[in-house]
Swiss-Prot record:
Belongs to the BPG-independent phosphoglycerate mutase family. A-PGAM subfamily. The keyword Amino-acid biosynthesis does not apply. PANTHER family: COFACTOR-INDEPENDENT PHOSPHOGLYCERATE MUTASE, METALLOENZYME DOMAIN-CONTAINING PROTEIN. Coiled coil: none annotated. The gene is apgM2. This is 2,3-bisphosphoglycerate-independent phosphoglycerate mutase 2. Keywords: Glycolysis, Isomerase. One of its GO terms (biological process) is glycolytic process. Pathway: Carbohydrate degradation; glycolysis; pyruvate from D-glyceraldehyde 3-phosphate: step 3/5. It holds the Pfam family PhosphMutase. Catalyzes the interconversion of 2-phosphoglycerate and 3-phosphoglycerate. HAMAP family: ApgM_A. Signal peptide: none annotated. It comes from Methanocaldococcus jannaschii (strain ATCC 43067 / DSM 2661 / JAL-1 / JCM 10045 / NBRC 100440).
Length: 428
């Protein structure tokens, strides 16, 4: 019995005047989603806590039943997705070439991503940057556009990922000083490591600015009235840690179908298979051929449409996705789940927002409720009101894999009914 989770990134939204005070999902014509809702069980899901906006990576981590304490941080997930070798005495951050202007207050970020810059220019800029500061080794791995993975290593392990971002993320803000975050440190030793790591990174970033500001590539770009790339903005410091694989935790062979290398990194971290797809349509067409217990199909299109801050763009994407979902060929005993990881408002200033998201379950074991349409408002009248941490338990339940609570099967506690070859059997 397969569980198929279709994840429409950032699907949840807010009402807007341009859509007659409806959300894009309410306004869109979605006959296929509505049919599934009418014949399934619906509700709302809060991925973490009401009102707290989440990023894609941590939202998925929670939806797959892992805790925030187990989450290593996005930097190392991104590094895994880029096939970068992961070392024990290193931390990993996302770094981006941006444009800043220095004034008496600090470095005002004009653009977090330098526009119209070639790969050749980027390589020449990066080749001029320092690789060592105060005993810490800095190494940049190109990712895409103006983005990199920054690996920082200290040979004796005197390093910590419990440090803050320099990238302010929001518009019209200044570069932030990297600081040790005391509340994340479990000991004074860890806090000391974090302070030294932050100090070295701040020194590195200032050195990088001095080099880039006067680099001949940027001097030439200024003459051509092009935006210079004069600062390296960092965020998402993280360090590798081992957690239970998805198979160990849930007893299901799993695959992720997605376009982004971020999901490749998540798959590698959790021991899931990864199939890179070029489109949501390709994923829909591929599902009938797959014999995994758990199939996760992700599309970023809904989220990207919301980021344009034009609700009509999101309506168009939702209607396109609905048509493709109508082509999905399910097996008789498949369990289908459709939901989002978070809400992405197509109006207002927020990047992501903290509202709950609609969710539907469709399959032979599901209790059908009275919901007739799939959207944020209709689903609020459905049977379900769940948190993200409960999703996988419901999937085990509706695929008849849930172990009776209190039973102890094998050498560790499980949520799922194990197969004989997964536990030691007593022999006479």
């Amino acid at each position: 019995m397969r569980a198929i989770l279709i994840l429409l990134d950032g699907l949840g939204d807010r009402a807007s005047e341009i859509l007659n005070n409806k959300t894009p999902l309410q306004f869109a014509k979605t006959p296929n989603l509505d049919r599934l809702a009418e014949n399934g069980m619906c509700g709302l899901m809060t991925t973490y806590k009401e009102g707290i906006p989440l990023g894609t990576e941590v939202a998925h981590f929670l939806l797959w039943g892992y805790s925030l304490e187990e989450f290593p941080g996005r930097g190392v997930i991104e590094a895994l997705g880029e096939d970068i070798e992961i070392e024990k005495n290193a931390i990993y951050l996302r770094a981006s070439l941006g444009f800043v202007k220095k004034d008496e207050k600090g470095f005002l970020v004009i653009d977090r991503r330098t526009k119209d810059i070639s790969r050749e220019e980027i390589e020449k800029l990066v080749d001029s940057l320092p690789t060592c500061v105060d005993g810490y080794k800095f190494e940049l791995f190109y990712s895409f556009d103006v983005h990199f993975i920054l690996k920082i290593k200290e040979r004796n392990g005197w390093i910590s990922d419990k440090i803050s971002d320099s990238d302010p993320f929001y518009k019209n803000r200044y570069v932030m000083k990297v600081k040790a975050i005391r509340e994340l440190c479990k000991s004074e030793v860890e806090y000391s490591k974090a302070k030294d790591t932050a100090r070295a990174l701040n020194k590195y970033l200032l050195n990088v600015y001095k080099i880039l500001q006067n680099h001949k590539i940027n001097r030439k770009r200024r003459k051509l009235e092009k935006m210079p790339a004069n600062f390296l903005l960092t965020k998402w410091a993280s360090r590798y840690k081992r957690v239970e694989s998805f198979k160990e935790k849930w007893g299901m062979n799993a695959v992720i179908l997605a376009e982004s290398s971020l999901f490749k990194g998540l798959a590698k971290f959790l021991g899931m298979d990864f199939i890179k797809i070029e489109s949501f349509e390709e994923g829909i067409d591929l599902i009938p051929e797959l014999d995994y217990d758990f199939i996760h199909l992700h599309t970023k299109e809904t989220d990207e449409a919301a980021h344009t801050k034009n609700p009509l763009n999101k309506v168009k994407v939702i209607e396109k996705i609905d048509k493709l979902i109508g082509n999905l060929k399910l097996r008789e005993d498949d369990l289908l789940i459709i939901t989002a990881d978070h809400s992405t408002p197509s109006v207002g200033n927020l990047i992501h927002s903290g509202e709950s998201v609609p969710i539907l379950f469709y399959g032979k074991n599901v209790r059908v409720d009275n919901v007739k349409e799939f959207n944020e408002i209709s689903c609020s009248n459905g049977h379900l009101r769940i948190r993200g941490e409960e999703l996988m338990h419901l999937i085990l339940n509706y695929t008849d894999r849930a172990l009776l609570y209190g039973l102890r099967s094998g050498d560790r506690l499980r949520y799922y009914i194990p197969k004989d070859d997964e536990i030691d059997l007593l022999e006479g």
